[in-house]
Design a protein with these regions (language model features):
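C-terminal tail/sorting-segment detector
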Residues: 683-686, 692-694, 748-776
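Beta-strand signatures of extracellular beta-sandwich domains
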Residues: 721-725
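Surface-exposed repetitive/solenoidal architectures
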Residues: 19-682
Length: 776
């Protein structure tokens, strides 16, 4: 940094002789510091006998309003001449002494550089320098043309602590900070800034505390900012704490507004390659261009234990995000959250782009975008090519095109995460790709142990969990209703990849105001991939080509069922409308009805079946139409009969059957995940720790009365029991399960119920009934 001083010094390497009328008491030592009693004394610091490495102390408040009328005959500065200006361009301009404000106030200090030089109260605080216990109010510091400005110092290599700034205005083209222009391997701690910071002439590095926090050893700690920060339209790297951060920022509390600027704007910093810890930003962001976010514009470092709670984060073009614009491949974000309203042409609740790691984090609020095609909006991350784990979004997503509750486009890894907000396109029949969790999962995308519960409304290719899947999705589910115009499903709109151990419970219908819809499937609209161990229980209502599980299958579906009610007018099928490829070990247990008297081409199991069905069943009691030769017709009461399934491949491996169940259920719903052997190498599925919907609890019985089993789902930890009552309400038996944590538990209820008779089985936790199941 010395080289920067030398270069910028130009013709000013010769120190000017500055007049001063200061007459300070003291000896300049730690025991007897020079005493600054008035403005004339302040101007004398660092000049003549008052050395740049001496000790100084304020003994009174200083009114510096006289600086407004001062000019320099030898320098470009109007007003106060910065301490160290006499040695500008040399190392002697560093203040390496101690300046103790003793909690006194310097007010109305005015310093303006008209030409090519920076300004502040100090030119530079050196590596040994200390400025502390100082208050400044109503000061005005400005540089018109080049480089840096700050209320306290242009540059800091030392220590600035316990400083309070109120109503100051600082402006410069670049490296502009409320306290310091550039903090290079120095420390700024226990400081407060309230005022205005302006970046002019479309330059970079503007911050509420420091313009640039450079060097790995630079530290900003325990600071508060309430700044009105503005930049010209093409200014870059703006943050309410620091324009850029290469060091450490810890415990920052931020309020205010950051307005204009081009790219890389953040509530803490525009760009971070260092560490940010325990920061809270409540500042609103209004920017013109990309990578604008509530905390950091662009991150390649570490961010942890931090949050954004902002009323508004807005970007005119190319995207805004609640927490970070871009998290690069080296970036790590953990234990952080955002609660904000985000609006741009593309909006992300937490991030626009993630190539690094995000874990244990969440987003809440609302995500909106302009009503135009070609842009993406999501509740958590717009595009993920990295890793996201143990995170969630409760944000609502409202826009037109390409929407998702958690990640719009995923080609990375997502594990143990969920989304609960709605995904709505304003009831438009146009627009493409909507997912309650992910919009599009690419061929390299892997999603495990995740779920979505929000309603999804989209023009086409809409799914309760994913709009379009080309990758792998394992052990995930969706419970939200889906309304669309074409190619939509309770779990997926289109599937070209692999879906294992998944289910959907939401109902399907048309967009409001549109009676017509096409290709709806209770689980998936169009399948051109591989699905194994999956089911759908929601009702399906679509005019053209609906199916209880899938509308059109041109892939492979194994070990699957649909139990909802299906209604349609044209080519409506119980399990599938059109099957072109392979179905195996599948059944339809719901009902099939025509939605209009002018219906055409129903199919109790399938309407068109040029493909193969190996071991398929349908509920003949639920179909009022002609028998279907594509699958075996079975009375609903007989669907739990074990002999029906003797021919099914690996039935005992994948299915559970007992007199407590109306039809077979899949083993994976009990928390056991049997290995699936595909065409290639075996797919190994480790038993996952499925996340559970907050507030959702469940008791699911299976097996026989003599060997009764249960799947217990808990949304919180607590002392858990299962109680069995007879029809008179008399308690018959209590099965103590002890302390159970949040999650899915497989429990043994052998001997809990009698061999005959109706019993009410109740799940209790901490003395409160959570769920009931009637055993007939």
């Amino acid at each position: 940094m010395i080289k920067k001083f030398m270069v910028l010094a130009g013709a000013l390497l010769v120190a000017p002789s500055l007049a001063t009328n200061g007459n300070m008491s003291g000896a300049g030592t730690a025991e007897s510091p020079w005493q600054i009693a008035d403005y004339e004394d302040l101007k004398a610091v660092g000049i003549g006998d008052y050395s740049m490495d001496g000790h100084y102390v304020l003994v009174a408040d200083i009114d510096a309003s006289a600086s407004r009328n001062e000019t320099s005959a030898t320098d470009s500065t109007a007003g106060f001449q910065p301490i160290g200006i006499a040695y500008f361009g040399t190392e002697q301009s560093y203040f390496d002494g101690v300046f103790d404000g003793a909690n006194h106030t310097i007010s109305k200090l005015y310093s303006m550089s008209n030409k090519e030089r920076s300004t502040a109260m100090f030119m530079a605080v050196g590596p040994k320098g200390v400025v502390k216990n100082l208050k400044m109010t109503d000061c005005y510091i400005t540089v018109k043309y080049v480089w840096a400005a700050g209320s306290v110092a242009v540059m800091n290599f030392g220590l600035i602590e316990n400083v309070e700034i109120k109503r100051d205005t600082v402006s410069a083209p670049s490296n502009t900070g409320g306290i310091v222009g550039i903090n290079e391997n120095g420390t700024v701690r226990d400081v407060t800034f309230e005022g205005v910071v302006l970046g002019i002439h479309d330059r970079d590095f503007i911050g509420g505390i420091v313009g640039a926090n450079t060097g790995a050893k630079s530290v900003i700690r325990n600071v508060k900012v309430n700044a009105d920060m503005r930049s010209s339209y093409y200014g870059n790297n703006l943050g309410l704490v620091a324009g850029i951060n290469e060091g450490t920022i810890v415990s920052a509390e931020i309020d205010g507004i950051l307005e204009h600027g081009n790219r890389f704007l953040g509530g803490v910093t525009g760009k971070n390659s260092g560490t940010i810890d325990s920061c809270v930003s409540r500042g609103s962001i209004f920017s013109m261009h990309e990578n604008s976010a509530g905390l950091v514009g662009y991150n390649s470092g570490t961010i942890k234990n931090s949050s954004v709670e902002a009323d508004s984060i807005y970007c005119e073009y190319r995207g805004a995000a609640g927490f970070v614009g871009t998290n690069d491949s080296t970036g790590v974000i953990e234990n952080s959250f955002v609660k904000a309203n985000v609006h741009s042409d593309s909006s992300g609740g937490f991030a626009l782009y993630n190539a690094g790691v995000i874990r244990n984090s969440y987003a809440e609020g609302s995500m909106t975008a302009d009503s135009m095609p070609g842009h993406c909006v999501s509740g958590f991350v717009v595009q993920n090519v990295g890793t996201i784990t143990n995170s969630y979004s409760k944000a609502d997503v409202d826009a037109f095109h390409k929407l998702a509750g958690f990640v719009f486009r995923n080609s990375g890894k997502i594990d143990s995460s969920y989304a609960t907000g709605h995904v709505l396109n304003g009831e438009r029949a146009s627009g493409d790709t909507y997912g309650g969790f992910v919009g599009q999962n690419d061929s390299t995308g892997i999603i495990t142990n995740s779920y979505a519960t929000g309603e999804v409304v989209g023009g086409m290719r809409a799914g309760g969990f994913v709009g379009i899947n080309h990758g792998k999705i394992h052990n995930s589910y969706a419970t939200g209703d889906v309304r669309s115009y074409s190619e939509f499903g309770g779990f997926a709109g289109n599937n070209y990849g692999e879906i294992l151990y998944a289910y959907a419970t939401g109902s399907l219908g048309s967009i409001k105001g549109y009676a017509t819809s096409y290709s709806a499937g209770g689980f998936v609209g169009i399948n051109d991939g591989y699905i194994n161990n999956a089911y759908a229980t929601g009702d399906v209502n679509s005019e053209f080509t609906p199916g209880g599980f899938v509308s059109r299958n041109i892939g492979t579906i194994k070990n699957a069922y649909a139990s909802g009610n299906v209604s349609g007018r044209i080519e409506f099928g119980g399990f599938v409308s059109t099957n072109v490829q392979n179905l195996e070990n599948v059944f339809f247990a719901g009902t099939l009805k025509a939605s209009s008297s002018d219906y055409n081409a129903p199919g109790c199991f399938a309407v068109q079946n040029p493909g193969t069905v190996k071991d398929g069943l349908y509920n003949k009691d639920g179909c009022e139409f002609e028998a279907d030769s594509a699958a075996k017709a079975v009375a609903f009461a007989d669907m739990k009969s074990a002999p029906l399934y003797k021919s099914w491949t690996d039935f005992d491996k994948f299915w559970v059957l007992g007199d407590t169940l109306s039809f077979p259920h899949l083993v994976f719903t009990t928390g056991v995940y049997p290995e699936i052997i595909g065409d290639g190498p075996p797919i190994e599925i480790a038993k996952p720790n499925m996340v559970v919907v907050k507030g959702a609890n469940g008791l699911k019985l299976y097996g026989t009365r003599q060997s009764l089993q249960a799947m217990v789902t808990l949304s919180r930890s607590g002392l858990t029991n299962v109680k069995v009552y007879n029809l008179k309400g008399t308690l018959q038996k209590t099965v103590s399960l002890g302390m159970l944590g949040e999650g899915v538990h497989h429990v043994n209820l052998n001997g809990a119920v009698d061999a005959h008779g109706v019993a009410l089985v109740v799940l209790e936790q901490n003395g409160k009934a959570l769920s009931r199941s009637l055993l007939r």
